[in-house]
Amino acid sequence: MTPELLTVLLITGGILIFLAIFFTLVPIPLWISSLAAGVRVSIFTLVGMRLRRVTPSKIVNPLIKAVKAGINLNTNQLESHYLAGGNVDRVVNALIAAHRANIELSFERAAAIDLAGRNVLEAVQMSVNPKVIETPFIAGVAMNGIEVKAKARITVRANIDRLVGGAGEETVIARVGEGVISTIGSCQDQKEVLENPEMISRTVLAKGLDSGTAFEILSIDIADVDIGKNIGAVLQTDQAEADKNIAQAKAEERRAMAIASEQEMKSRVEEMRAKVVAAEAEVPLAIAEALRDGNFSVMDYANYLNVTADTKMRQAIGGQSSPNDTQ
């Protein structure tokens, strides 16, 4: 291989390597597309995006859409939002939709909403086309104790000014449910709700439930009303059952106390009977001592025996028994 041929090969290889690096760093097709769309983006700007690890197509393509829609944006705005972790394409689409619908929305506001985790495009679309939120059955109890179940449809429109920091759909549903329960509870009976369900809508809508939320409530419509259980009767039945159990417990307590008192009386009777038997056992000893001392004569003892025998005979005739006989 001659030196001239080697030089040509090295030069050719160097040119190919340079072109490969150049086309890698500089997206020529994208640059041509931007020029054709009337968007002035320099090649050095595209190279700078590559060096900052930014995909040029994710900046230039949304910029082309924005310029064609008549929105004045630049690459620095889109690139800074991209580097902050935002969705550039969705923000630009939201700006275009807001511009077409004559909704005032700046890029800074849209970028802040997007970085806050909200879907700014969906919010703009909801501002143009309100969303209907359907609640589950909400149960309330009228004054007569009858349960009334109501299902509501809430028509809301996104409030772009309150998207950042405003409460979501769950809060709206919870507030509407609270208002429905309160309104049903203020009715005398279930007939009042069935005859005039729009009363619930008017009462709940007048409370300003969209305060502090990301939505503006346009209307609240009662879609369905159903009658549930007789809660008042259930509560009365439960109360009666509880009262019965309490009365039974108190009666059982009194019965136990009566049984204990009866057993105590029996014990006292047996105690007294034992004392009588003990006293009777001392009688012969007292008689013997009286005979020895001369305080009790034989005739007196004979009379005592006659009286005792007469008493036993009378008790036998009367069907009674002396304490000694029972022992």
Curated annotation (Swiss-Prot):
Matching InterPro entries: FloA
Compartments in which it is found: Cell membrane; Membrane raft
Transmembrane segment boundaries: 8-28, 29-49
Tagged with keyword Ribonucleoprotein: no
Keywords, comma-separated and alphabetical: Cell membrane, Membrane, Transmembrane, Transmembrane helix
Membrane-topology descriptor: Multi-pass membrane protein
Gene Ontology CC annotation, any one: membrane raft
Subunit-structure text: Homooligomerizes.
Stored NCBIfam families: PRK13665.1
Similarity-based family: Belongs to the flotillin-like FloA family.
Biological role: Found in functional membrane microdomains (FMM) that may be equivalent to eukaryotic membrane rafts. FMMs are highly dynamic and increase in number as cells age. Flotillins are thought to be important factors in membrane fluidity.
Name of the protein in its database record: Flotillin-like protein FloA
Organism: Exiguobacterium sibiricum (strain DSM 17290 / CCUG 55495 / CIP 109462 / JCM 13490 / 255-15)
